[in-house]
C-alpha cells in the first residue's frame, strides 16, 4: 500500500513537471516562432503601402477605424533606393530602402517590430515619410529573418543579436558619406530594443527614438505569460525554452539599463496600449530621472499600440523634427 502511494505521488509530481514544461515550451514557441512574411503587407512599397489592407484584422474597433480612415496617399514616397549591406555580425546580408533626399542633412535608421513585419509595414513607411517631410533623410531596414534580409533562424532573437543589424546599417551610412553625429535611430515596438542596444555599442549615435518599447524583462515576461492565461510561476520554464529556441538568454532583455548619460532619447507610448503596457513607459521615465539620462517623454492620449503616429501624425512629425534636429548635426 505504501509503495503504491509513493508511485502515485511520484507519478503526480512527474505529470506536474511535464505539464509545466509543456506549457513553458508552448508559450516560448508561440512568442518566438517567426512568420518571415510581411503578412497582409507583403510586397508593399513606399508608394503603395496602405493601412486599410488589414484594418479589419484589429479586434479593437478604435484601432481598426483609425487605420481604415488614415489618408495613406498623402504619405506615399515615390523615390527610394533598394540597398544591401552587411550586418556587423559576419555572414548576414541585410536589405533596406534608402530615402536620401537632402544633401548635408541628418538621416534616421528606422527599425520595425516583431513578426509579421518588416520595412514593408505602414509604421516604417509612415515614419520615413514624416521624416522626409521635415527635411530629414531616412533608411528603413529589414532585420535578419525578415523581408529581403537573410534568414538565419526561425526564431526571434528579441534584438539581442539583431542589434548588430542596426550597427550594420550605421556602418553602411558612414561608408556612403554620412557622419556619425548625423545618424539617428528610430525603433518601433520590439524594434526599439536592437536600437537601444546598438546605440549602447556606438556612443557617437546621439539621438535614439523609442516608440512603444519594452523596458525590463521580468515585466514583459509577466505580461506575455498572462496573455496565455498563466501566472508568473511559469516564467522559468518559458525563459528556459526561450533560450533553447532563440539561442539568446532572454533574461538579458533589459533595454533600460543600456541607456547612457551621453546620448539623447525620446520615448513615446500609447496610454491605452494593451500590447506593450504603458508601465514600460513609466519604467523608462523613472529610470531616466533617477540616472540623469537625457530624455524626452510623450504619452499619446487615447492611443493603443503604435497608434500615436497614425492618430497624431503632424504632432508626431513635429516632435521628431525637434528631437533629431536638436541632437544631430
Give the label of every model feature segment.
Residues 197-248:
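Hydrolase active-site cap/lid region
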Residues 282-329:
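C-terminal catalytic histidine-bearing segment of alpha/beta-hydrolase fold enzymes
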Amino acid at each position: 500500500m505504501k509503495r503504491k502511494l509513493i508511485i502515485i505521488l511520484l507519478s503526480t509530481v512527474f505529470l506536474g513537471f511535464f505539464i509545466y514544461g509543456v506549457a513553458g515550451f508552448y508559450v516560448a514557441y508561440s512568442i518566438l516562432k517567426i512568420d518571415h512574411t510581411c503578412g497582409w503587407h507583403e510586397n508593399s512599397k513606399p508608394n503603395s503601402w496602405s493601412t486599410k489592407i488589414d484594418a479589419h484584422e484589429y479586434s479593437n474597433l478604435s484601432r481598426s477605424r483609425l487605420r481604415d480612415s488614415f489618408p495613406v496617399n498623402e504619405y506615399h514616397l515615390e523615390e527610394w533606393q533598394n540597398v544591401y549591406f552587411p550586418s556587423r555580425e559576419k555572414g548576414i546580408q541585410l536589405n533596406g530602402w534608402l530615402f536620401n533626399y537632402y544633401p548635408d542633412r541628418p538621416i534616421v535608421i528606422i527599425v520595425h517590430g516583431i513578426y509579421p513585419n518588416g520595412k514593408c509595414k505602414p509604421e516604417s513607411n509612415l515614419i520615413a515619410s514624416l521624416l522626409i517631410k521635415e527635411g530629414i533623410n531616412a533608411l528603413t531596414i529589414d532585420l535578419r529573418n525578415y523581408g529581403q534580409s537573410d534568414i538565419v533562424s526561425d526564431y526571434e532573437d528579441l534584438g539581442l543579436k539583431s542589434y548588430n543589424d542596426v550597427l550594420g546599417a550605421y556602418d553602411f551610412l558612414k561608408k556612403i558619406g554620412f557622419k556619425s553625429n548625423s545618424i539617428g535611430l528610430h525603433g518601433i515596438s520590439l524594434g526599439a530594443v536592437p536600437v537601444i542596444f546598438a546605440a549602447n555599442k556606438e556612443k557617437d549615435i546621439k539621438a535614439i527614438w523609442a516608440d512603444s518599447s519594452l523596458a525590463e524583462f521580468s515585466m514583459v515576461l509577466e505580461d506575455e505569460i498572462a496573455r496565455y492565461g498563466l501566472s508568473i510561476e511559469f516564467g522559468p520554464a518559458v525563459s528556459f525554452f526561450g533560450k533553447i529556441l532563440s539561442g539568446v538568454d532572454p533574461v538579458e532583455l533589459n533595454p533600460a539599463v543600456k541607456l547612457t548619460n551621453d546620448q539623447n532619447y525620446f520615448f513615446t507610448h500609447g496610454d491605452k496600449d494593451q500590447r506593450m503596457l504603458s508601465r514600460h513607459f513609466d519604467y523608462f521615465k523613472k529610470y531616466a530621472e533617477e540616472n540623469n539620462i537625457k530624455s524626452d517623454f510623450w504619452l499619446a492620449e487615447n492611443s493603443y499600440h503604435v497608434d500615436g503616429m497614425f492618430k497624431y501624425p503632424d504632432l508626431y512629425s513635429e516632435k521628431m523634427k525637434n528631437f533629431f534636429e536638436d541632437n544631430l548635426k
